Amino acid sequence: GNKHSLVNDQVHDVMEDSDGDLWFATSNGSSLYQTDTKEWHSFFSSFDPIPDDKNHIFLTLCEVSPGVIWAGGFTSDICRIEKKKGFNISYLSPTTIAGVRPDQYIYDIKKDSNGDIWSGGYYHLKRINFENKSVRLYPGVTSITTIQEKDTRQMWIGTRMGLYQLDKESGIYQYVDLPIESPYICALYQRDDGILYIGTRGAGLLVYDINKKKFIHQYRTENCALISDNIYTILPRQDGSLLMGTENGITIYSPKAHSFRNWTREQGLMSINFNAGSATTYSKNALVFGGNDGAVRFPTDIEIPEPHYSRLLLRDFMIAYHPVYPGDDGSPLEKDIDETDRLKLTYGQNSFSLDVASINYDYPSNILYSWKIDGFHKEWSRPSQDNRIIVRNLPPGNYTLQIRAISNEEKYKTYETRNIQIIITPP
């Protein structure tokens, strides 16, 4: 809580204002970083002179007019900071104006193209006219997580139970039918050509065609190289790709190639667990993500390093679940299994196993293994991180065991294939 840093390391939202300064909503107040002077200021924290009964946990920030910042969090009041008036602080209570019960919290505040301010929380969605401070309530949807303008007439409203399209005038909500039951919406990004990217908690990245009103794709850890099914933030980059924050690191998604490139703690990324909605572009050439360890700044054109790979290693050869070593009595191994390219086994040794591994590798979770025995299996095994090969009751004959190391990020890229000739003698 000093004047030289963030007031608190748990960053729930981050925003660049019209002066190019950065604001942070944290678990103990809000922080401002002034880009020119490199000075920090904090507001509403336990270190600041504010009434004890006031909330310190902030979840969202919005610049409602130049130099006027609204902050929302675990209270139904909105806190207002006026930068140009010596950081004058005041409180606004939209629920009181609207004559409804106080909200448990305010999760998102957004300004639309008409200049109206939208505030979404546990109970209510409200539209606040900034000029006359009148409030319109939009009943019908609760547990709001994220608000995004669709166009001048409509809004996207993300909730813990799914996504809605709201008509601003009629107040009618339309539920967007997504291919998963009650998705928890964390992040929304709408492209100019009518493609909506939906980041969820637990269901990966969903892609929706607004014009055709149909869902195009669902990316999950099980069908692509995504490192997490929790997509907390989505930021566009100049080249058309998207930079996304998860609880396992960041991932760059290329819509053209339908590919993902990941940067994780394994590869030296510092803060790992990013928070939902906590990201912004900053000074045109940087992206700032907030997480459980403060905030991390990346250049917009960051290139995630190409994964480095070295060779495939074979080890831990066993027959009938007993370890076997070269030179042992009755052992089929003349040298270590990693140096063996031909294995002659008796009929009684036709159930065996071995492990595969990749050495000197900076990103182990990107390696998947697949194998098959030519002459016995028709198909390769499904690529997975399971590195144990188990063969049971292989009939007498001549075979080739083939083992592949495959990239999880680029499913069609085989790093290496190893072969062992296997002979099972008749009884």
Where are these regions (language model features)?
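Residue-level "micro-hotspots" composed of small/polar
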Residues: 1-12, 48-58, 98-102, 140-143, ...
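Residue-level detector of Asp-centered blade-edge/turn motifs that repeat once per structural unit
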Residues: 16-19, 63-66, 111-114, 148-153, ...
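Conserved beta-propeller blade signature
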Residues: 21-24, 68-71, 116-119, 154-157, ...
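Loop/turn residues immediately N-terminal
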Residues: 28-31, 74-78, 122-126, 160-164, ...
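Short loop/turn segments that connect beta-strands within beta-propeller blades
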Residues: 34-38, 82-86, 129-133, 167-171, ...
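Solenoidal tandem-repeat scaffolds enriched in leucines and small polar residues
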Residues: 105-108, 121
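Beta-propeller domains
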Residues: 123, 145, 161-164, 183-189, ...
